[in-house]
Regions:
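Helix-start/capping segments and mature chain N-termini
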Residues: 1, 20-21, 33-34, 148
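A detector for short, charged/polar N-terminal pre-domain segments
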Residues: 2-20
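Nucleic-acid-binding surface
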Residues: 9-13, 24-29, 44, 56-161
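Short amphipathic alpha-helical interaction segments
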Residues: 31-45
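A short, conserved structural fragment
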Residues: 47-54
């Protein structure tokens, strides 16, 4: 990537960052490309960038990022579980309206912040149990952590109402 002084406009730098990173970029990505924090703020105010969450941005015009991509960028500690995992493994033909995500108990603020972007049902898990059965899988072209089949079935019995 080129720096601002190399005759690139701020808009060109932003477009290069999104070409390199994807549909959602962090403020640090723009800063390492040569923009200043106040430039990012000004681009948001002009309507060129849109703030997804503190420190995360997307282009204001264009396609909305996939829910899977938003989850992978903004909920780095979330694991797909229960209804969403059942659908992923083909145990259910019912596509859930909201993502079932397991998070450590200390991440309640993170979940509340992301619920404005993606419908999420959070399952708060104790830290010793959180990583048991964790694996990864492709969701619509994006790799997300998901609990394995055995953990999914056990969690369904645990959380049934």
């Amino acid at each position: 990537m080129q720096k601002v002084g190399d005759r690139l406009s701020k808009y060109d730098i932003v477009n290069e960052v999104f070409d390199a990173i994807g549909e959602i970029a962090q403020k640090s990505d723009f800063i390492s490309a040569g923009l200043k924090g106040q430039d990012v703020y000004a681009l948001c105010k002009q309507g060129y960038l849109e703030r997804v969450k503190k420190g995360y941005y997307k282009l204001a015009v264009g396609d909305e990022p996939k829910e899977e991509l938003i989850l992978s960028k903004l909920m780095t500690h979330g694991v797909v579980c229960v209804e969403s995992a059942l659908f992923y493994y083909g145990y259910s033909d019912f596509a859930p309206r909201e993502w079932s995500i397991a998070v450590p108990r200390s991440y309640s603020r993170t979940v509340k912040a992301i619920q404005a972007e993606v419908p999420v049902k959070a399952y708060y898990v104790q830290n010793p149990m959180y990583h048991i059965g964790e694996t990864t899988g492709p969701f619509n072209g994006v790799t997300l952590p998901v609990y394995d089949r055995e953990r999914t079935i056990c969690d369904c019995f645990k959380y049934r109402t």
